[in-house]
């Protein structure tokens, strides 16, 4: 745009110069013509028709010279205009080429697309990256759901009783573990005392002690606890069996209800607690 504005200004200045030259030439021609007319008038009075013919020839010759001068002046600026226009176009093309070369030679960051082709490629790459991230997030969400499927956060306020039971179980387990450790240590100390002061026997005893011994002691503790629990359960079961062996107060609840009675005497069966038959029918007959 700046080059075009400069070219227009140059052409306008040249046109003004040409117009001023033309005006000057016209003024010169007019002054020469007026002088010739004055001379013609003077010569006409003295010489006559011959002088007038010569003046006409001079007038025409001067006019032709003026026209030729104008044509030459017009031809010269036209050539100058053509040369200046060619130079201006060449300069504009060179400037445009330089600007494009600078733009293309610049190292542009990927985040700022300046060319449409690069912009499209970057958009495609960004879409691919977004899809990959979404797929990874979906896979991670699935894994978390699978891991957290059976996990439930306990509510301490609502599950107070369950928490207390768990605490009791934990305390029992810890107490049992420490008791087993203490018992195992006592057993080892007793065996060492029995061995006496011999170092070999002590070394053999210490080497013979293994994890299995401790686990057996721990299992023995578990067995004793389980035996106690089983004994308590057996006593409770026996009590329930004794209660069940006792006959119910109502005869309908017995297992042998209506097993020995005949169907004809069904209306004579009493609903009393003693199970005796009432002879209502016989009394009424008598």
UniProtKB/Swiss-Prot annotation:
Keywords: Acetylation, Citrullination, Coiled coil, Isopeptide bond, Phosphoprotein, Ubl conjugation
Comp. bias intervals (Acidic residues): 65-84
Region span, Disordered: 33-93, 220-286
Residues bearing the modification Citrulline: 9
Pfam families xrefs: Rrp15p
InterPro entries membership: Rrp15 (IPR012459)
Gene Ontology BP terms: maturation of 5.8S rRNA; maturation of LSU-rRNA
Coiled coil is among the record's keywords: yes
Protein modification: Citrullinated by PADI4.
Positions where N-acetylalanine occurs in the chain: 2
A GO term from the CC aspect: preribosome, large subunit precursor
Coiled-coil portions: 112-148
Residues where Phosphoserine is found: 11, 62, 210, 270, 284
Record-listed cross-link Glycyl lysine isopeptide (Lys-Gly) (interchain with G-Cter in SUMO2), residues: 112, 183, 212, 243
Top-rank taxon: Eukaryota
Cross-link (Glycyl lysine isopeptide (Lys-Gly) (interchain with G-Cter in SUMO1)): 243
The UniProt record lists the keyword ATP-binding: no
Family: Belongs to the RRP15 family.
Name under which the protein is recorded: RRP15-like protein
Protein's gene: RRP15
């Amino acid at each position: 745009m700046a080059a075009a504005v400069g070219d227009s200004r140059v052409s306008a200045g040249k046109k003004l110069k040409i117009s001023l030259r033309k005006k000057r030439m016209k003024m010169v021609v007019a002054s020469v013509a007026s002088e010739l007319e004055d001379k013609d008038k003077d010569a006409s009075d003295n010489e006559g028709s011959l002088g007038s013919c010569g003046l006409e020839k001079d007038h025409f010759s001067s006019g032709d010279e003026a026209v030729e001068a104008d044509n030459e002046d017009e031809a010269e600026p036209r050539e100058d205009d053509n040369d200046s226009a060619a130079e201006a176009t060449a300069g504009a093309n060179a400037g445009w080429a330089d600007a494009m070369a600078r733009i293309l030679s610049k190292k542009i960051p990927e985040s700022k697309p300046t060319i449409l082709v690069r912009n499209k490629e970057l958009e495609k790459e960004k879409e691919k990256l977004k899809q990959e991230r979404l797929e990874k997030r979906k896979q991670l969400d699935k894994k978390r759901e699978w891991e957290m499927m059976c996990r439930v956060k306990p509510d301490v306020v609502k599950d107070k009783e369950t928490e207390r039971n768990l605490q009791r179980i934990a305390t029992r387990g810890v107490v049992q573990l420490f008791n087993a450790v203490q018992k195992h240590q006592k057993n080892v100390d007793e065996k060492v005392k029995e061995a006496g002061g011999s170092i070999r026997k002590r070394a053999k005893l210490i080497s013979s002690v293994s994890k299995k011994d401790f686990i057996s002691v721990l299992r023995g503790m578990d067995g004793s606890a389980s035996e106690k629990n089983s004994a308590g359960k057996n006593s409770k079961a026996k009590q329930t069996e004794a209660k069940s062996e006792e006959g119910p107060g109502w005869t309908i609840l017995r297992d042998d209800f209506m097993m020995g009675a005949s169907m004809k005497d069904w209306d004579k069966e009493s609903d009393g607690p003693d199970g005796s038959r009432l002879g209502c029918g016989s009394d009424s007959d008598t």
